[in-house]
Amino acid sequence: MTLTRIGPRIAFVACVAALPVVALGCPQAGDQGRAEFDAFFEKVSEAEAELFRGRPEALQALWTREPEVTLFGVSGGSGAHGWDQVGPRLDWTRTQYSDGSLTITRIAAYVSGNLGYVVQLENVRFKVPGHAVESFLQIRATWIFRRERDGWRIIHRHADSLIKRQGPAELNAVEQP
């Protein structure tokens, strides 16, 4: 076996180059990975706009079917866990939204390796099917994504109404169940 002596400068460069892998435990996404993620999220945004028109199919197709999938929707409730709950929850939206439009303000987005997230504000105008009155929702949304064998997939969404900021002193006491 032959040993090769390396200088301190080369050792330093090698250590710096390895830092993201060691510190984060996974390779960085790089420009190509980020471009793929951004293209996928563009599909998510288009599909979400369709959901508010009463057509959830395009968005449903972008979700993982793995058991750990979760959805905490803007309509409240205890949330959905597993595709057997998430799928029907998305189906239910067709009875809640029609003639909708969506405007998005992205707050943050990040991708590293096989995981990514997006945090955004969503302004939605829609009608409840069968009603003429237009409604308006302001939503805070967090999406989490994972790259799977067949590409990027949604693994979690948490959305809630954008409400007025309140401190504990301003809240009414709520009875515990």
What are the residue ranges of the model-derived segments?
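Glycine-rich beta-strand-turn "strand-cap" elements at beta-sheet edges
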Residues: 107-111, 159-162, 171-176
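Bacterial N-terminal signal peptides
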Residues: 11-22
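Short beta-strand edge/turn micro-motifs at domain boundaries
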Residues: 117, 138-168
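A solvent-exposed, acidic/Ser-Thr-rich amphipathic alpha-helical stretch
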Residues: 35-39, 56-113, 121, 135-136
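Short, low-complexity N-terminal intrinsically disordered segments enriched in polar/charged residues
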Residues: 20-65, 114, 170-177
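N-terminal secretory signal peptides that target proteins for export/translocation
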Residues: 1-6
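Generic short beta-strand segments
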Residues: 120-127
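Extracellular loop and loop/strand-boundary signature of outer-membrane beta-barrel proteins
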Residues: 129-131
